[in-house]
């Protein structure tokens, strides 16, 4: 039942992303880094999980946000916004609850955008064969998903209740490259540097769950699939990348 509920959550988020895309003509960016950083001194950038709030029955919360200032849980014009608990962002199999106690008590999200196969750090690439759907200021169109919307992973799930896994937060990113609160996760790695599998040990992994045998992912077309722990790692890597042109092996 918990896995079924998780699938439903992911489908609703994928639908919200599609509705955002219909309204704005682009997929929401992984996070938005403004040109003027005067009010963003800590690198607290609003992310895709915030931008889709109006499409998940959270218009009132969205309307409280001053996007000209960063998010901070304890100070500033947006004080407290990031601590809002959103049940639809959390997998019921993660016993941590709706607040991410490993991420400064911000509102938890088990559902992360697919960043790509490179490490997440302060140099955020915008063109690469390792690129995923959600990067800095990305704003992709479906036509940019060269490998096909039914073949490309858009969202994964990451738990926070065991090991070094810290789940995520729905609001955005912070202090990139230094153990940030984060709304994105990474795939298995490049061809020469495989660091993750499904339920792999890397803390940045996109896909780790308490569901027996694997984890759920949502693809760009809105469908949800269950990827097993034994998935071909090359296939998983190709599913993360939006434009590598590779045929996904069995």
Feature locations, PLM:
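Surface-exposed loop/linker segments characteristic of extracytoplasmic
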Residues: 2-250
């Amino acid at each position: 039942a918990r896995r079924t509920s998780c699938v439903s959550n992911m489908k609703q988020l994928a639908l919200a992303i599609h509705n955002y895309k219909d309204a704005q003509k682009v997929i929401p960016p992984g996070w938005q880094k403004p040109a003027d950083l005067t009010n963003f001194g800590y690198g607290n950038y609003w992310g895709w999980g915030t931008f889709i709030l109006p499409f998940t029955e959270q218009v009132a919360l969205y309307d409280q946000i001053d996007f000209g200032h960063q998010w901070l849980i304890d100070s500033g014009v947006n004080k407290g916004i990031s601590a809002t608990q959103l049940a639809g962002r959390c997998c019921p199999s993660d016993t941590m609850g709706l607040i991410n106690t490993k991420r400064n008590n911000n509102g938890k999200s088990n559902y992360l955008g697919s960043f790509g196969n490179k490490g997440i750090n302060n140099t955020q690439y915008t063109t690469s064969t390792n690129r995923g759907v959600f990067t800095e200021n990305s704003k992709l169109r479906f036509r940019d998903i060269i490998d096909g919307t039914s073949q490309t992973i858009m969202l994964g799930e990451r738990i926070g209740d065991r090991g070094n896994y810290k789940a995520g937060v729905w609001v955005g990113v912070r202090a990139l490259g230094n153990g940030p609160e984060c709304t994105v996760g990474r795939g298995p790695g490049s061809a020469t540097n495989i660091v993750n599998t499904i339920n792999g040990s890397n803390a940045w992994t996109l896909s780790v769950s308490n569901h027996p045998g694997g984890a759920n992912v949502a693809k760009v077309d809105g469908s949800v699939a269950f990827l097993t722990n034994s998935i071909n790692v090359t296939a998983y890597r190709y599913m993360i990348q939006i434009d590598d042109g590779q045929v996904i092996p069995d």
